């Protein structure tokens, strides 16, 4: 049997069999967890589908809801990392931040809808509302500022600093744009 379990809310951690050191607060939080360990889920349906994932933190309504086997994710905000299934080491802070990320790994996003449409892109950093919003499969981009690189879909190794910096870039690689307003 599992040790170190805290479950508050209807169906919270109800399927847990051997996962140790899990905390679930909220209706259906960590409901599908069976053997995943060291997870924290706070909010209605937070980490709902996690079964064997470990060392994940999800705070907010439906944060990390689709995660099944992912490890080391942090999702803070309503629907942050919503579609995430198995990628690891993603950090998403803000409503709908990395909403569509399924298998991408090593991404860091902060801001409302930052990296919202990312699917499998890896090692990206987006800070600011809608920064890198349309990124789908691109890797190694850094966008800092509201709407920085928000139009980028597949361009890699880009750096954009400032409000709307590189907003029109969609597929270019190795661009560096700095806008000061």
Tell what function each PLM region has.
Residues 1-181:
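Glycine- and small/polar-enriched repetitive beta-structure motifs of secreted/surface proteins
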């Amino acid at each position: 049997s599992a040790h170190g379990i805290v479950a508050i809310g209807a169906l919270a951690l109800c399927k847990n069999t051997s996962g140790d050191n899990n905390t679930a607060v909220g209706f259906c939080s960590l409901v599908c967890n069976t053997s995943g360990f060291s997870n924290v889920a706070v909010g209605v349906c937070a980490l709902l589908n996690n079964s064997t994932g470990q060392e994940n933190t999800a705070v907010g309504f439906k944060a990390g809801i689709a995660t099944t086997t992912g490890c080391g994710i942090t999702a803070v905000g309503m629907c942050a990392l919503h579609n995430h299934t198995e990628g690891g080491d993603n950090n998403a802070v803000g409503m709908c931040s990395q909403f569509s990320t399924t298998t991408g790994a090593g991404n860091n996003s902060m801001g409302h809808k930052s990296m919202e449409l990312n699917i499998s892109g890896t090692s990206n950093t987006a800070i600011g509302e809608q920064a890198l919003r349309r990124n789908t499969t691109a890797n190694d981009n850094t966008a800092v500022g509201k709407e920085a690189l928000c139009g980028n879909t597949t361009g890699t190794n880009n750096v954009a600093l400032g409000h709307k910096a590189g907003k029109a870039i969609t597929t270019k690689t190795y661009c560096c744009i700095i806008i000061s307003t």
